[in-house]
Amino acid sequence: MIPPSFEYLTPSNISDAVALLQKHGDEAKILAGGHSLIPAMRLRLAEPGYLIDISGIGGLDYIQEESGQLRIGAMTCEAALEESEIVRSIYPLLLDTAKMIADPSVRNMATVGGNLAHGDPANDHPATMLALRASVVAEGPNGTREIKIDDFFPDFFTTALAEDEILTEIRIPSPPSASGGAYLKIERKVGDYAAAAVACQLNIDSSGSIENIGLGLTNVGSTPIRASSAEELLKGKKPDENMLAEAGRLAAADSEPMEDLRGSAEYKRALVNELTQRAIKLSLQRAEGSR
């Protein structure tokens, strides 16, 4: 299907892009890599009258550690995450996630910021950022503000960004020693949206007990979901098989899947149960290996 006509705008900096958003309001959409927005436009799920392309704006594609956090520019492509030595050595959850997005040609174009700003619960990074307890930086006419990721997805295909704000950066707390993470996903074919997926990030103490844990669920609700019941169960514990099974059950209970072409709600809850247990086990193994 061909999208309806629109006016294509190419601002030279963020301030100009914000001014265009102010001018055109809800008729405008930001275009970054286009991996999420363009397919939605072709299906006429999004019909902007104005498309504001920020891909030519410099200074928004970086990955750097600074002041106890990993800072990722919103225009950083998925392939850059795969290639980053910082990500490969310290953030296995991010690496797992980037590798599972579509195919290499798409990952060379699709951006981390776009994956979040589209507000799609089927996208992979929202759950990953929940597990990592990230925050995002938004820039608008009144300056910049930082938004916790738990507050960023209030509803289906909706974000906390104002109409005249642009997501410019993602900030992730640097993990302590003995940390590990994993992203596990079931899809009908490679590169497809998940039937269900689970992101886990944790760190352990000297005895192997979990000090802190984050669990995010992909595509099993109208928004990305934090499996808070399972997090609360596991914090401060050294889980055995029975506790892992209970964590899986609790995560499945926190999910809110709907039946679609990827499976029934019951099937998706079963996936969440199993993937949660596997993601925690793999994260624990990686945490032990990072001591």
Predicted stretch roles:
Residues 1-291:
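C-terminal structural segment of proteins
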